[in-house]
Amino acid sequence: MTNVGTVRTAFVSGASRGIGLACARALAETGVHVVLAARDAAKLEQASSEIPNSTWVTIDLSSADSIKEAFAKAGKIDILVNNAAVTKDGLALRMKKDDWDSVISTNLTGAFLATQQVLQGMMKSRWGRIINISSVVGEAGNPGQANYVASKAGLIGLTKSLAQEMASRNITVNAVAPGFIETDMTAVLSQEVKDNIIGHIPLKRFGRAEDVAAAVRFLASEDAGYITGAVLNVNGGMYM
């Protein structure tokens, strides 16, 4: 197992289910204290009860005040996983501005504001790991998801800029770009749609949340200390 360390604290947004929950579990297995964050308090409490050495806070990534409050409760953070995301799909021609703003606000601006909350502490301790969960569509594009794609592509740009700004303080900033993963978001797809997607994946299957979590666990570890500004694709070869 890739060891992160026993004195670190990780903050994982969108941690009540899916990829975020898998990331929280994977990091906890390395001995770090994990702060689970999401909107749903009941789901967070249940998830935290199943993960040793974890706590939870509610957070609304579309609200600057909520972000500040959540990180004030969480305390000093050594590892930040910006995972929370929403979708409001639609063709660009008909997309409402509110749907654009909502997705960008949560997925991109929320990640930026969360990152701002942890930078000072990381800089002071001269150690930090920031891992942004992007998406294969942030690299390849996808029709009907202009807002979501823009937010995920923006996370990659944010990752690269922050990596250059923070390198001198021994803070690494990387992105993980999942492909199609078995989550609540993909469970609603028809079998016909799933089969069509799998036909474009060289490994011929959807990924698991644990596949993404393994990449996050590695990037959070000491073993990944010389990796920064990278985008780690976890997509079964769908996009290269």
PLM regions and their residue ranges:
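Substrate-binding pocket helix/loop in short-chain dehydrogenase/reductase
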Residues: 91-92, 96-104, 197
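Short C-terminal tail/terminal secondary-structure segment
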Residues: 6, 140, 217, 228-240
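Residue(s) in the substrate-gating loop at a strand-loop-helix junction
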Residues: 135
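Conserved glycine-rich cofactor-binding loop
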Residues: 16-17
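Alpha-helical segment proximal to the catalytic Tyr-Lys
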Residues: 120, 164-168, 225
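Active-site loop immediately N-terminal to the catalytic Tyr-X3-Lys motif
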Residues: 93, 140-146, 168-169, 204, ...
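Active-site helix of classical SDR
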Residues: 115, 151, 159
